[in-house]
Amino acid sequence: MVKICCIGAGYVGGPTMAVIALKCPAIEVVVVDISKPRVDAWNSDQLPIYEPGLDEVVKECRGRNLFFSTDVEKHVAEADIIFVSVNTPTKTRGLGAGKAADLTYWESAARMIADVSKSDKIVVEKSTVPVKTAEAIEKILTHNSKGINYQILSNPEFLAEGTAIEDLFKPDRVLIGGRETPEGKKAVQALKEVYAHWVPEDRIITTNLWSAELSKLAANAFLAQRISSVNAISALCEATGANVSEVAYAVGKDTRIGPKFLNASVGFGGSCFQKDILNLVYICECNGLPEVANYWKQVIKINDYQKSRFVNRVVASMFNTVSGKKIAVLGFAFKKDTGDTRETPAIDVCHGLLGDKAQISIYDPQVTEDQIQRDLSMAKFDWDHPRHLQPTSPTAFKQVSVVWDAYEATKGAHGLCILTEWDEFKTLDYQRIFDNMQKPAFVFDGRNVVDPEKLREIGFIVYSIGKPLDAWLKDMPAVA
């Protein structure tokens, strides 16, 4: 029986291994993690991450050929194929701080694999890593090999949170990068055979190691670039009276461009986009390509600009101050159908409003109060380090309350900011919300979720990103 072990039970490792176990009943799959609370959660009815369809997959396989354990060394030693799905956060200190990937967890995983292995292994990079990481990992393993052969493969994930299970069931492509040696090709074939249980052969792409590593960074950079492009156009739409939804629809009808990732918003978030672009920037700088580095930096600059522009619009519209005013925030996750708050634009928007002494009431159907307070009190990039290295008792913001009901959040509020595109926000009773808010009542729609005209008929003053401005907003100070 082939044995697979995955180091890291997070957003990538957990769902990926659950689907492999479901599709390959003859393979034993063990997900290991040093965090006991996380492993306990995977072994309970309350999984540590929210992902549509994940519960059903885990329940079907767990205890049959899918296991979750903290006994890392035992399962690594027994495995034929080891997936490494540990965090590669952005460095917060030292060389490359603020840009380069921190490979501390990857390196310690590689050293542990070398220490405990007694048989040949295929080691698979699943986390997003800088180009040439495989080379560094290979050196650690071969210098500590004790006669054991290791083959390193790159098999980057292309999951979108909120649709991860669907993406795993029907992937656009599975990418496997390996050494172009007989042993390397054999390792690639072994991993291909795992995916071939459910992925059509024409969707399994094989490349060299470096192409696979760079493809993941490039894919995320291209997606983020599209979001920043449409967000840049949204600012121009507001200035000229154009409607960004109409512009994006017209542009997306060009088959060379297509309609995906052309929704203007308050900005992109999530664990990958910013981190991977910063990593790309650092790699370009290290390879003497400053012009290329500056090009990709601009994608992040536009994203930061969009978030600050949104905050400025809120403050400017409300008589140039939100001090002491209650602002309701609907949505804190970085997008709908996930509880993930990593790099969510909501953090920057809340910080901007708190800086002007606003009172904030937050509602998100999937994010806990503890997580929100932790996110608001944490230094940038600390979110991507293991929980035990994060502040244990984050400083709670007294101006922030977290509630479990949208109507409670908006009661008595002066303004309402929609920061995540949860479907339920489209069907709220906005007449009821209006009746319970202070007047004039403002709605700032950072995800273009609501129909601005319908809300104006109720009596709201509405700002929707990239849409023609309300007469009220036109009279307020210009927002840059």
Curated annotation (Swiss-Prot):
Catalytic activity line of the entry: UDP-alpha-D-glucose + 2 NAD(+) + H2O = UDP-alpha-D-glucuronate + 2 NADH + 3 H(+)
Top EC category: oxidoreductase
Residues the entry annotates as binding NAD(+): 8-13, 33, 38, 86-90, 127-128, 161, 272-275, 342
EC number(s) per entry: 1.1.1.22
Active-site annotation: C272 (nucleophile)
Keywords annotated in UniProt: NAD, Oxidoreductase, Phosphoprotein
Pathways per UniProt: Nucleotide-sugar biosynthesis; UDP-alpha-D-glucuronate biosynthesis; UDP-alpha-D-glucuronate from UDP-alpha-D-glucose: step 1/1
Cross-referenced Pfam families: UDPG_MGDP_dh, UDPG_MGDP_dh_C, UDPG_MGDP_dh_N
GO biological process terms on file: glycosaminoglycan biosynthetic process; UDP-glucuronate biosynthetic process
Modification sites for Phosphoserine: S393
One GO molecular-function entry: UDP-glucose 6-dehydrogenase activity
This protein's record includes keyword NAD: yes
Positions of substrate binding: 157-161, 216-223, 256-269, 334-335, 447
Gene Ontology terms: cellular component: nucleus
Annotated InterPro entries: 6-PGluconate_DH-like_C_sf, NAD(P)-bd_dom_sf, UDP-Glc/GDP-Man, UDP-Glc/GDP-Man_DH_C, UDP-Glc/GDP-Man_DH_C_sf, UDP-Glc/GDP-Man_DH_dimer, UDP-Glc/GDP-Man_DH_N, UDPglc_DH_euk
NCBIfam families registered for this protein in UniProt: NDP-sugDHase
Family affiliation: Belongs to the UDP-glucose/GDP-mannose dehydrogenase family.
Known role: Involved in the biosynthesis of UDP-glucuronic acid (UDP-GlcA), providing nucleotide sugars for cell-wall polymers.
Protein's name in the database: UDP-glucose 6-dehydrogenase 5
